């Protein structure tokens, strides 16, 4: 019982922390991805914003288009290999750090699109009205657009949290002991997986 309680706590803590960090990542990416530019803007600004949008698009497509278990393997095992040990996750604290990083950046990729969609769903007339009274883009975003956009995407934040609770089960591949991994280990210790016997206690 104590083992299950401890691992359920690990699962919930990982899901909460990673969801919060992922929301911050998604919020930043969503805002940066919707910064407007026109032909009248300096070429450097237009180039920088186009490059930024391209990098965000690559990030979103890669982490939304690949399984989380593959991302976990690459970050936990691949980064130490490719950096010749400069980046390494050692001990339980390292495993926790890797798990949080994996789930956070995965969540951030999904939240980036949710935030972008929430921002562009706001009536453009509100942005034009804010500019007409002399508000800067930053003031318009923080005072007019974001409060409405965040309210619209609150259900998606809840959905991502629920998904993260379930997806933490793939973190066993890097040694993270959450509820699913502990349950599987206990079943292997105390039950027989024989197709004939079913899951029966070992004699």
Annotate each PLM feature.
Residues 1-192, 196, 202:
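Transmembrane alpha-helices and adjacent helix-loop boundaries
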């Amino acid at each position: 019982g104590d083992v299950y309680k401890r691992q359920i706590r690990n699962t919930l803590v990982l899901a909460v922390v990673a969801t919060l960090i992922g929301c911050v990542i998604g919020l930043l990416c969503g805002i940066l991805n919707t910064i407007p530019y026109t032909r009248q803007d300096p070429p450097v600004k237009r180039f920088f914003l186009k490059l930024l949008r391209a990098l965000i698009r690559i990030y979103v497509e890669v982490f939304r288009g690949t399984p989380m278990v593959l991302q976990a393997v690459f970050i936990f095992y691949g980064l130490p290999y490719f950096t010749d040990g400069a980046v390494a996750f050692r001990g339980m604290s390292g495993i926790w750090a890797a798990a949080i990083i994996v789930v956070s950046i995965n969540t951030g990729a999904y939240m980036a699109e949710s935030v972008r969609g929430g921002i562009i769903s706001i009536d453009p007339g509100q942005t034009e009205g804010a500019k007409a009274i002399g508000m800067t883009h930053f003031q318009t975003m923080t005072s007019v657009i974001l409060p409405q956009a965040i309210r619209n995407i609150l259900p998606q934040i809840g959905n991502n949290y629920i998904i993260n609770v379930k997806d933490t089960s793939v973190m066993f591949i890097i040694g993270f002991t959450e509820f699913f991994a502990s349950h599987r280990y206990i079943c292997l210790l105390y039950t027989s997986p024989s197709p004939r016997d079913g899951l029966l206690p070992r004699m």
